[in-house]
Structures are given as C-alpha cells and as structure tokens.
Amino acid sequence: RKGRYNYKEASMAKTNKDAAFGLRAIGKVGQNRDNQGLGEYSISSGDTTKIFFQDAVSATAAGTIHQAAASEAFLLGSLNGVFYTDPTTSKPTFANHYEGSIAASDIKAFVADDPYERFEIQSNKTSAHAQTDVFKNFNIEVTAGNAANNVSKSELNHSTSTTGTAQLKVTGISTEIENSTIGAANLNFVVMINEHLYNAKNNGI
C-alpha cells in the first residue's frame, strides 16, 4: 500500500555491519529455564596464548582449558572472564580476558559452558548468504581480538560448510536489526556447539 513501510524490502536492501565479537551466549535451546550460569575452569600457569572475551575455549589433556583452535574438538563454550592473583602485585585480579603468559597457580576461567547454550556469531563470508546455511555445520575462524577492549573477533568460517563433523551447528539467523540480512555479507548466525565436550557422543580427553 502506498506510503506503507515495507520492512521486507528495506531488510533486503540492507548490508550487515562488519563487527565480529566471537561467540556471544544468548540463551538455551528450547523452553527450559536458563540461569546463564558460568562454569569455572583452570588455565595453566604461564600459558602464552591470549584468550579474548567470547573466544571459544576447549579442554586439554592436562585438565585445563585454552583458546580453541580452528577445527579443534572438545569445545566447552566461550570465555566470559578470568580471576587470578597477580604475580607482581599479589592482588586478586578480575579481567574480561586472559592476557597470556601469567605466572599464577590460581588462574580461573569463567565459561558459558552449557552444551545446550545458543550463541550468536558473525560469518566471515564476504558475499550473500542463503537460508540453506541453516542446519549446516561449520568451523570457527580464529583471529586476534580487539586490542582496545579485548573482545574476540573470531568468526564462523563459512568456507567450512558441511553436513559432516564441525565445531558449530547453525540453528537460525540472528534477529539483530543490523546483522540479519541473509542476502548480504557478514550475517550473524545463531549456533550451538556441535563438538561439545559434554555431548554424550564424545569421549573423554
């Protein structure tokens, strides 16, 4: 109708905002209650790899966690902060990220680790997406995070699309107004961790 705002046409004309943020927890699948609690895990003293806020993390055979590499299995979720005793000042320290190379025996990481948690993540594809991306599996593209605020810039690696095994399973398209245009680059997907350590099908490590 003349003069009426056509949301569908406006959305199709939009571009998505290119601003990756890692894996942002948005709530559990289904209708069960989500308390958005975080699991507590250890990081090895002196681990040299920086883990940014909302980076994916995975379990190690040492009983600790570290930044998950692309295609690595045994994922636990995304990092939401750390606590440790600063080795220089001896003060208890909280941070939204793990800086790396911290010589402390009490480094604790707080992780959104529910195996049924849903996350939002941006795709690295630089051209149009498709509805058929939903229910496919993908790996993560791990990149250095934002140096200013220490937020992850990891993305869904669209080129790894498969119906076989991969780290993430797409369950839907974001409803965020700036990143929900399917026919454009940098689409935000809703995903679950497909290779979660706590999935019954996975072995121990």
Report the location of each language-model feature.
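Catalytic phosphate/metal-binding cores of nucleic-acid and nucleotide-processing enzymes, i.e., regions
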Residues: 4
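Extracellular interaction modules
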Residues: 1
